């Protein structure tokens, strides 16, 4: 089945270039150039992944990202001409999985897309992994606390499972970027990891300000806390 990519960008020349790149990879592209129309186009097109510009006429990409996240956990990659911390963090906190600054090389965009589309979490033989008082059903991609199901995005699930599968190992942010996002080059922005850990903690920790399940290792990164099996 052909992968469908929704490209939301008011720069029509850039969108056309992205469409050509997507076509060479065998992906189908759907385009939207105005923020006010983006959510309707999303609902009508039912894409597998969204490329979403931050700066759009009518409604900005951060607000659109929040709208999409109310109904879907599909991968969202923000496109931004700004490297400003506030814009990057706002997009990630709104629910974006990744971001790529303009201008970008086509091969870098393709690599980011493939990393987000790649199903990694169900690799391996185990069906359930325990992490603190959480039970992770690997095959079903579900997380439970007792009988309560905790809704995570696929990326949040991957992050939690990666930590749970290597109990007591302290992962550097760079290691997590390679493991979860597929980045294999130096000088990558580690804010991606920090923001997604915050989002994950908000969902799984009973007290996110004093986390017990995903712990910070000062000067290193993050590790699983509690009993993991």
Show which residues each predicted segment covers:
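Short hydrophobic/Thr-rich beta-strand motif most characteristic of the beta2 strand and flanking loop
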Residues: 26-34, 41
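Charged docking surfaces used in two-component/phosphorelay signaling
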Residues: 16-24
């Amino acid at each position: 089945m052909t992968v469908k990519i929704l490209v939301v960008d008011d720069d029509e020349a850039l969108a056309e270039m992205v469409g050509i790149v997507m076509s060479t990879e065998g992906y189908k592209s759907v385009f939207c150039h105005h923020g006010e129309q983006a959510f309707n186009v999303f609902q009508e097109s039912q894409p597998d992944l969204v490329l979403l510009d931050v700066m759009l006429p009518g409604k900005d990409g951060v607000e659109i990202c929040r709208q999409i996240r109310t109904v879907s956990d599909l991968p969202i990659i923000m496109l931004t001409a700004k490297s400003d911390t506030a814009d990057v963090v706002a997009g990630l906190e709104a629910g974006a999985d990744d971001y790529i600054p303009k201008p970008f090389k086509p091969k870098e965009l393709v690599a980011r897309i493939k990393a987000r589309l790649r199903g990694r979490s169900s690799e391996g033989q185990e069906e359930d992994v325990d992490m603190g008082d959480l039970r992770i059903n690997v095959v079903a991609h579900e997380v439970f606390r007792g009988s309560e199901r905790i809704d995570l995005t696929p990326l949040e699930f991957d992050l939690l499972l990666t930590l749970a599968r290597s109990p007591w190992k302290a992962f550097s942010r760079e290691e997590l970027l390679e493991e979860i996002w597929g980045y294999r080059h130096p000088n990558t922005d580690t804010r991606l990891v920090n923001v997604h850990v915050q989002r994950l903690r908000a969902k799984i920790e009973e007290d996110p300000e004093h986390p017990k399940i995903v712990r910070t290792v000062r000067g290193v990164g993050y590790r699983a806390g509690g009993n993991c099996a």
